[in-house]
């Protein structure tokens, strides 16, 4: 199959072959034959590459579909697939795509990042990284939240690599993107239905149910975006501590609300209040990943979900957050740092009992941050704040 794919690249994807082979390009976006954009270092640029016409672009996409055993035509106008080289591709053809065949190729990264790499990139501080390492070691359930392209999968890869090698991991994804190094790991991937071949679909929810019967120590779901959220919550609440997943949301509080909404999408009817309590109980640590306007991907918040307040709102306390302090105009990059917010997690005693080297002083915010936050604290105390519980801890 790989040779068919390579032949398809040589024959049909000549106009973008240099982009596919350029390691600095992370994503290729085709908006019809004459308009191609690429993402480099988190920023999007217009490329000079072009296809000769719509017919040649569609021919290229049909060849790609064929190389992965799929069809894209008027009856099947959308293609979502993983290519043999690991890249993800999504295609929509006319008339659904009015400006011409539209394609997004997210290239597979051969580079396996570590926490040290994220520290070197400025995505997270050494103390915050060490704290996350401890959370993994202690078996805390972790939800990685963020928008598209914010680095959620990379973070999940990094955290998964810190799981003790003696534990059995079951990893479930729509398309294989995670590359977690472990001695005892099993990968599952969903399958789309193909009525022409009498092939039924296998969903993430199906695989979560199977995973629970395969004696996992931890279950990792690459992306939670449907009714399988309820199954993951139940996994986390029934003895499989240290499980992880990602979700699309903009803040720690929003990530909990998003999970709650996804849980309610299924056929199992559970009262919303009960779902909310289950989510609050399961989600212990939330790692919020964000992509900033300078192209940088950073951990904007590390928060602990400690329950629900008297009004039924999720209580998420920031432990660390990234704060912008300036801008490097020469390089167009934001300047900032990850700072502790002054909140000590409820499981700090576990850190002490396990003799993990992380003193309470690591949670004390710097003076400049405290002074910066004093006006906000005063406003909130006077009842004029916005009530964002994820920021109240600061």
Please describe what each predicted stretch is.
Residues 1-9, 301-394:
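NTP-binding/hydrolysis catalytic cores, primarily Walker-type P-loop NTPases
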Residues 1-48:
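N-terminal anchoring/assembly modules that precede and organize ATP-driven motor systems
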Residues 11-18, 64-81, 167, 266-273, ...:
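Active-site phosphate-binding and catalytic loops of NTP-dependent enzymes
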Residues 146:
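The Walker A (P-loop) glycine that initiates the GxxxxGKT/S ATP-binding motif of P-loop NTPases
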Residues 151:
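Conserved glycine(s) of the Walker
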Residues 274-310:
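Phosphate-binding/switch region of NTP-binding enzymes
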Residues 22, 39, 45-138:
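P-loop NTP-binding catalytic core
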């Amino acid at each position: 199959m790989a040779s068919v794919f390579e032949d398809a690249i040589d024959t049909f994807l000549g106009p973008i072959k240099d982009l596919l082979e350029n390691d600095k390009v992370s994503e290729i976006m085709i908006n019809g034959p004459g308009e191609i954009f690429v993402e480099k270092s988190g920023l999007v640029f217009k490329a000079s590459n072009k296809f000769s016409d719509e017919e040649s672009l569609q021919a290229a996409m049909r060849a790609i579909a064929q190389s992965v055993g799929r069809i894209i035509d008027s009856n099947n106008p959308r293609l979502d697939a993983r290519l043999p080289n690991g890249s993800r591709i999504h295609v929509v053809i006319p008339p659904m795509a009015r400006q011409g065949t539209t394609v997004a190729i997210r290239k597979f990264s051969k580079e396996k990042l570590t926490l040290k790499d994220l520290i070197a990139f400025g995505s997270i501080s050494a103390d915050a990284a060490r704290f996350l390492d401890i959370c993994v070691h202690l078996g805390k359930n972790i939800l990685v939240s963020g928008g598209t392209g914010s680095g959620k999968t990379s973070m999940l890869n990094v955290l998964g690599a810190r799981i003790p090698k003696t534990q059995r991991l079951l990893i479930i994804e729509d398309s294989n993107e995670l590359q977690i190094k472990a001695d005892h790991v099993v990968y599952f991937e969903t399958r789309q239905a193909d009525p022409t071949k009498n092939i039924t679909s296998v969903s993430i929810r199906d695989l979560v149910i199977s995973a629970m019967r395969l004696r996992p120590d931890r279950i990792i779901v690459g992306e939670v975006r449907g009714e399988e959220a309820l199954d993951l919550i139940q996994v986390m609440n029934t003895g499989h501590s240290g499980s992880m997943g990602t979700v699309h949301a903009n803040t720690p509080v929003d990530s909990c609300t998003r999970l709650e909404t996804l849980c309610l999408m299924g056929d199992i009817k559970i009262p919303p209040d009960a779902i909310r309590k289950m989510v609050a109980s399961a989600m212990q640590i939330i790692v919020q990943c964000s992509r900033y306007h300078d192209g940088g991907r950073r951990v904007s918040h590390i928060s602990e979900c400690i329950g629900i307040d008297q009004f039924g709102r999720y209580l998420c306390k920031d432990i660390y957050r990234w704060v912008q302090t300036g801008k490097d105009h020469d390089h167009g990059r934001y300047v900032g740092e990850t700072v502790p917010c002054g909140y000590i997690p409820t499981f700090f005693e576990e850190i002490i009992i396990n003799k993990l080297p992380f003193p309470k002083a690591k949670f004390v915010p710097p003076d400049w941050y405290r002074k910066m936050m004093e006006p906000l604290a005063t406003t909130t105390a006077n009842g004029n704040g916005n009530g964002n519980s994820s920021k109240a801890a600061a």
